[in-house]
A protein has these predicted regions:
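Membrane-aqueous junction of the first/signal-anchor transmembrane helix
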Residues: 1-221
Length: 221
C-alpha cells in the first residue's frame, strides 16, 4: 500500500543527490580555478618579436663625420595572461659589411609625419602587458664599443659606418641582412632576421644629396 511518506522520502533522496552533485561540481570548479591560478603564477611571459616590414636607411652626422643610421618599427607581442609583464631593457640592429659586424642601439621612440621621423622621447626600458602588442617606431644609432669587447684590429668607433663607404657597398650589393634584437630583463633576447631589398629606387634616393634616406622593404629570413 502506498502512503504519502514514501513520496516524501523519494523527493528527499533526489534533493540530496542534486545537492551532492552541485557540491561536487563546485569543488571541481574551485580545484580547476586554483590549478589555473597556480599555473598562471609560475608562468613566465611569452614574448615574440615580429619582423619589421621595412627599415629606413639614412645619413646622420657626428660633427662633420657622416655615418649610417636606421629607423624601423619593433612590434613585440606578449602571448601571456594580462598580469604577466615582460620588461624590455634594450633594442638593437646588427649588420655585417665587408666582414665587419656593426651594432646600432635604440636612441629614440617616435612616429612618421609629413617631415619624416619625429622623435617623441628617448628610448628607455618599458613593460609589455600580457595579451598586448607594443608597437613603436625606433631610431637606431651607433655607440662606442667597450675596450674589453674590441676584437683585434677594431677601434672604439667601429660601429660608426662611414656614409660614403656604405654607398660604395650599396653600389655593388642588392641586399643587406639585418639582425633585430630585443633585450629582456634577466638576460634573455628576442630575435628576428630580415634581408633589406636594395633595389634601384632605394639606391637613387640614398645617393641623392637633397634626400639621403630611403625605406628598404624587408624579406623575412
Amino acid at each position: 500500500m502506498n502512503n504519502g511518506h514514501s513520496g516524501s522520502s523519494g523527493q528527499a533522496s533526489v534533493t540530496a543527490i542534486v545537492g551532492l552533485a552541485a557540491s561536487i561540481v563546485a569543488l571541481l570548479v574551485s580545484v580547476v580555478t586554483a590549478g589555473y591560478n597556480l599555473v598562471g603564477y609560475f608562468q613566465k611571459p611569452e614574448l615574440t618579436l615580429l619582423p619589421p616590414e621595412q627599415v629606413t636607411l639614412h645619413i646622420n652626422y657626428s660633427g662633420k663625420f657622416a655615418y649610417l643610421a636606421m629607423v624601423t618599427d619593433f612590434n613585440i607581442f606578449n602571448d601571456s595572461r594580462p598580469e604577466k609583464y615582460g620588461l624590455v631593457t634594450g633594442e638593437r640592429l646588427e649588420f655585417t659589411i665587408d666582414g665587419v659586424r656593426r651594432v646600432l642601439r635604440w636612441q629614440e621612440f617616435g612616429k612618421w609625419g609629413d617631415k619624416g621621423f619625429q622623435a617623441s622621447g628617448p628610448a628607455q626600458p618599458f613593460g609589455v602587458a600580457g595579451g598586448t602588442v607594443n608597437a613603436q617606431e625606433v631610431s637606431f644609432e651607433p655607440r662606442s664599443k667597450d675596450q674589453s669587447e674590441l676584437l683585434p684590429g677594431e677601434t672604439e668607433d667601429i660601429n660608426w659606418f662611414d656614409w660614403d663607404k656604405f654607398l660604395q657597398f650599396m653600389g655593388k650589393a642588392s641586399t643587406l641582412r639585418v639582425h633585430c634584437v630585443v633585450e629582456l630583463h634577466g638576460g634573455k633576447t628576442l630575435t628576428s632576421d630580415v634581408e633589406l631589398q636594395l633595389h634601384e629606387g632605394v639606391k637613387a634616393a640614398l645617393q641623392d644629396p637633397k634626400r639621403r634616406w630611403a625605406a628598404a622593404a624587408c624579406k623575412k629570413l
